[in-house]
From Swiss-Prot:
PROSITE patterns for this protein: PII_GLNB_CTER (PS00638), PII_GLNB_DOM (PS51343)
Gene3D superfamilies per the UniProt record, alphabetical: 3.30.70.120
Protein name: Nitrogen fixation nifHD region glnB-like protein 2
Residues making up the signal peptide according to the UniProt record: none
Organism superkingdom: Archaea
Stored InterPro entries: N-reg_PII, N-reg_PII-like_a/b, N-reg_PII/ATP_PRibTrfase_C, N-reg_PII_CS
Entries under PANTHER family matching the protein: NITROGEN REGULATORY PROTEIN P-II, NITROGEN REGULATORY PROTEIN P-II HOMOLOG
One Pfam family, short name: P-II
Gene Ontology CC terms: cytosol
UniProt family annotation: Belongs to the P(II) protein family.
Keyword terms: Nitrogen fixation, Transcription, Transcription regulation
Gene: glnBII
UniProt xrefs under SMART domains: P-II
GO molecular function, one term: enzyme regulator activity
Length: 121
């Protein structure tokens, strides 16, 4: 099993979710996050309200910008399909398109049923 963590533009969340659901991957966790990459923030990128305005207005070159972080757990054989789908929706060729991390998962347990492994996905 693989954990896929994708950090994407908030404006691409709905389309990414629709594509993943269409491929049979409706289960995911989404979080609003702040961060920055090599581009040192893109002005006007705000996709949601930020409670702590100080994070957006740091002195100097470093500004944090809102992103959406998706987390999915998929069988090993589906990881490439999911990564390619996320890339297809989110790749514009511009700074800020995001990052995707693929990590191994040792086990999953559903608390309610005690199912383990891929049966728990």
């Amino acid at each position: 099993m693989k954990e896929i963590i994708a950090i994407i533009r908030p404006s691409k969340m709905a389309q990414t979710k629709t594509v993943l659901e269409g491929l049979g991957f409706p289960a995911m966790t989404a979080n609003r996050v702040l961060g920055r990459g090599k581009q040192k923030a893109i002005v006007g990128e705000l996709g949601f309200e930020v409670d702590n305005k100080e994070l957006l207005n740091q002195p100097g070159d470093m500004r944090y910008i809102p992103k959406t972080m998706l987390t999915l757990i998929v069988p090993d054989e589906d990881a490439s399909l999911v990564v390619e789908a996320i890339m297809k929706v989110n790749k514009s060729g511009q700074y800020g398109d995001g990052k995707i991390f693929v990590c191994p998962i040792e086990d999953i347990i559903t608390v309610r049923t005690s199912e383990r492994g891929e049966a728990a996905i």
